[in-house]
Amino acid sequence: VCGRQLPHKDANPLAVHARNFNYSSKSIVKSKADIEKFGIKTVFMSNSFAAYRRSVFEELSGFPEHTILAEDMFMAAKMIQAGYKVAYCAEAVVRHSHNYTPREEFQRYFDTGVFHACSPWIQRDFGGAGGEGFRFVKSEIQFLLKNAPFWIPRALLTTFAKFLGYKLGKHWQSLPLSTCRYFSMYKSYWNNIQYSSSKEIK
């Protein structure tokens, strides 16, 4: 189960919209039966504010030993596959947000692309993120038009940075290791990486 995250008081308009978009005021419980309806959002989870039933966590071997990020999504996906349910509790609230620069968003989405490249079974079983990404951009522009129109150029630049970072991350094995480390937000991840066409974390 994960709770609701609200933006910090000093959050910029992009950070405010991101939290409003991803963390609604309505609680929900999702299971394998919801995959067709929610797609990859079925396994949305955030370790910034989450708890796992220990018995189930240990039954499914816990978090993967070597993943660049999104171990929370990984575990939620394993739980759904095993027939368990995951919950979002909107009544449990914390403040958590980041005022990322376009460069930092590029790095974060590069790492997200690496994660999906190394765990392709998640998108294979739950669907891709393209549709959700388009819905996010549309919602963001509408939010900014109403609340902070001068931030729209920054939003467009950030969207391009995310897209480029994600696409490069999905094809990280075609890049020099030094380039991957430079593009990545989590530099230490690359210390023990070896190239492999079959490298998949499951």
Provide a role label for each language-model segment:
Residues 31-55, 67-68, 74, 116, ...:
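A recurrent flexible, glycine/aromatic-enriched loop bordering the glycosyltransferase active site
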Residues 50-52, 56-61, 66-93:
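A short, conserved alpha-helix in the catalytic core of glycosyltransferases
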Residues 111-114, 118, 122-202:
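Non-catalytic, C-terminal membrane-associated alpha-helical segments of glycosyltransferases
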Residues 16-22, 104-107:
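Short, hinge-like loop/turn segments at secondary-structure boundaries
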